[in-house]
């Protein structure tokens, strides 16, 4: 215990969403492996209890990770989860500020040296400032999306408005223009989820507070955007440290943050398939398509002659939504699961392509696994990520423009895109581009690579008491 109390202690605070928990927990494991103590904090609901059950987590118990340790803490936010994001955020901020302060006090014999949050809990920066603890942020979207929010907040270019909803946004980095339905949709005045954009903008307002903005990307992938933002905001320390899931592969640890136990025989089933014969399908944890769109996708797969591994999650508890139903023929031809270890699935040679909602975690995992993507974005950063995969990274094909498109993509179009991504010259081109990005990603996290160097510099600051004291005096 004496040795553990002498290790530098970092506290990570995550918004309660799988797409936020996964990358922040990966970061936590990598930090811990360098010889630090990491306390990972999120709420009991809606995911904390499920995480415990799926991963046998014990609150407050230190588990060894590399040279250090990691533990979990969960707190009640007093909110019954429904579809009201505003109420969730208000409740989360009120309870979160109180509970994080209590946790910092609880571990005063292992003083918290740094607070790290993701962008959906921007108030963590305020707590750090109040307690005079240095802070950092993990940005779990692309640097391009960060730039879009920054440009919007500072009114550097014109964005769509209620009177001019179809403005094209000009940006000084690739792809140079973003159509009105290609910007992060939370910034569009017609978005029913604009309050989510408001939360992210609260983090943009606080970009001057953290001593480091860690970005889940890598220099080679978004070089011009990262360089542009570094020049535009010289007072902000932008550090691309991704892909985190590739970096985390080197750590031997059974710590996971999944909200469901993954299907145990996915890989065995893939082993029984021919190379490049399976379409992997997942729309993340929150995107929930209409049943008639699910029907069209299912019949499109059947018409293509390909097999599929489809992650089909039940609706979140508390939401009045009927579970999806698939044709029996598809269930016989493919494999339907509620959850799987996506990074292992994407790395399997049987997987030909990925039909994805284009969340950034999925985008990074596909790019760094060398797998082409059929883009079916819904909202938020997904619509922007799709543009980059199709037009900039050149590893994707478009199947949808997003939920605002308000159309059901027919089965004929689904089958056509599936075959285009798996057979012929275009398929070869997509896979070759994806292979190149995979190599770039591996180089970035290898010893001496751009992400590895950025991450090591960040850890060196966490470990060095003098550096952290100086940072604290500045903030």
From Swiss-Prot:
UDP-alpha-D-glucose binds at residues 342, 357, 360-362, 365, 381-382. It holds the Pfam family UDPGT. It catalyses: (E)-4-coumarate + UDP-alpha-D-glucose = 4-O-(beta-D-glucosyl)-trans-4-coumarate + UDP + H(+); (E)-ferulate + UDP-alpha-D-glucose = 1-O-[(E)-feruloyl]-beta-D-glucose + UDP; (E)-caffeate + UDP-alpha-D-glucose = 1-O-[(E)-caffeoyl]-beta-D-glucose + UDP; (E)-sinapate + UDP-alpha-D-glucose = 1-O-(trans-sinapoyl)-beta-D-glucose + UDP. Its EC number is 2.4.1.120, 2.4.1.177. The active site is at residue 20. An anthocyanidin binds at residues 20, 380. Coiled coil: none annotated. GO terms for molecular function: cinnamate beta-D-glucosyltransferase activity; hydroxycinnamate 4-beta-glucosyltransferase activity; sinapate 1-glucosyltransferase activity. Belongs to the UDP-glycosyltransferase family. UDP-glucosyltransferase that forms glucose esters with phenylpropanoids. Glucosylates 4-coumarate, ferulate, caffeate, sinapate and cinnamate. PANTHER family: GLUCOSYL/GLUCURONOSYL TRANSFERASES, UDP-GLYCOSYLTRANSFERASE 84A3-RELATED. This is UDP-glycosyltransferase 84A4. It comes from Arabidopsis thaliana.
